[in-house]
A protein has these predicted regions:
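Active/ligand-binding-proximal structured segments within catalytic/core domains
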Residues: 1-34
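Charge-rich, well-structured scaffold segments of protease-associated domains
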Residues: 27-210
């Protein structure tokens, strides 16, 4: 409900990006990679403000080329591999109207290592492989548009909450906004809302909390 009106679906996209690692995890050379990521972010801001189709195509080609170069520095799926290495299963997440939940099933003797990875992951957001992740988000959007239940729910929420984000925007966002993403807005949203007083950790199972 707190996603900016001009970039709906932002919270859900951020959820995806938090599986891409951190400054330490998911890269072979963070200093080089962050330069390329900043170039991509800057180009997306220009892209969003450009209406001329030929100019947009040229900018997108630049984004595509730099994204490819940046992908050579990144280590894909390293977060997932780090969780598998400690015996974790069920790595997942979902975004709803009021919260985003991240889920792991971890061995009781790996709680400390799990916490160490999370303590690095959440504050050190890296919008790594941002360009290619759009494809996964588009696919989710397409699946939702083909789902009658979801379509009915969107219409119902729009009727019930005509002046509230519950009804004026959807969790996954509009096609227009997905086609014109803002890495800058995602970073700012993360800095504002992914803070200790907005987060909680719920744990259950055979472990010693002390």
């Amino acid at each position: 409900k707190n996603a900016p009106a001009e970039t709906t679906g932002l919270a859900h996209y951020l959820e995806h990006m938090l599986f891409k690692g951190s400054h330490q995890l998911g890269t072979t050379d963070w200093e080089r990679e962050r330069v390329e990521i900043q170039k991509i972010e800057n180009l997306y801001e220009v892209y969003r403000q450009t209406s001329d189709s030929s100019r947009r195509a040229a900018i997108y080609h630049q984004i595509d080329s730099i994204s490819y170069a940046a992908s050579k520095i990144a280590i894909a799926n390293e977060y997932d591999k780090s969780m598998t290495a400690i015996g974790s299963t069920g790595t997942n997440a979902f975004t709803s109207n009021d919260f985003t939940m991240y889920v792991e099933n971890i061995p009781s003797n790996q709680v400390e290592q799990w916490a160490r990875v999370q303590g690095d992951r959440f504050p050190n957001l890296v919008l790594r492989l941002f360009h290619t992740e759009l494809e996964a988000v588009y696919e989710e959007k397409n699946i939702g548009m083909a789902n009658d239940g979801r379509r009915v729910n969107e219409v119902m929420m729009a009727a019930l909450f005509p002046h509230h984000p519950y009804g004026t925007q959807t969790t996954i966002g509009t096609i227009e906004h997905l086609k014109n993403p803002s890495m800058k807005n995602i970073r700012e949203y993360h800095a504002k809302y992914y803070v200790p007083n907005n987060m909680c950790v719920a744990m259950a199972g055979d472990f010693n909390p002390d």
